Regions:
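A short glycine-rich, His/Asp/Glu-containing loop-to-beta-strand
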Residues: 1-32
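A structural signal for the main folded, soluble domain(s) of proteins
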Residues: 4-5, 18, 38-41, 68-70
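Conserved hydrophobic/aromatic beta-strand scaffold that supports enzyme active sites
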Residues: 12-16, 34, 50, 58-60
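A generic "binding-loop/recognition-motif" signal
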Residues: 21, 30-31, 49, 65-66, ...
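Short beta-strand segments
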Residues: 23, 49-51, 92
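Glycine- and acidic-residue-biased ligand/ion/polar-headgroup-sensing regions
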Residues: 29-48
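Short acidic-glycine-tyrosine-enriched beta hairpin
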Residues: 46-67
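Double-stranded beta-helix
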Residues: 68-103
């Protein structure tokens, strides 16, 4: 990922998910997120409900909601993540499932 903005009020990242890749199924105690797809098609799981989002579509992820994004397509998926809350630290991640065995 690439950090575009890192302030006291929000953090903005550009995240690329390679074909066949996915992020952890996770949630956060101290922040909410908004994801906006800018390239590709995202398969997004929110509390066990799966939906597909393409270019320009956004999804709001409230604090505490379990979430994951997957790229089931043949082209890279790129989305913008805007974080709001009291902490944007990478330690505020509770991973339920992770392909890389991170805690």
């Amino acid at each position: 990922f690439e950090i575009l903005v890192d302030s006291d009020y929000c953090k903005v990242k550009r995240i690329t998910v390679n074909p066949g890749g996915r992020l952890s199924y996770q949630y956060h105690y101290k922040r909410s997120e908004v994801w906006t797809v800018v390239a590709g098609i995202a398969t997004i799981t929110l509390d066990d409900e799966v939906n597909w989002y393409d270019y320009g579509k956004s999804v709001k992820i409230p604090q505490g909601m379990k979430h994951r994004v997957e790229n089931k397509e043949q082209e890279p998926l790129i989305f913008i993540e805007v974080q709001h809350g009291s902490s944007f630290d990478e330690t505020d991640i509770v991973r339920i499932e992770d392909d890389y065995n991170r805690k």
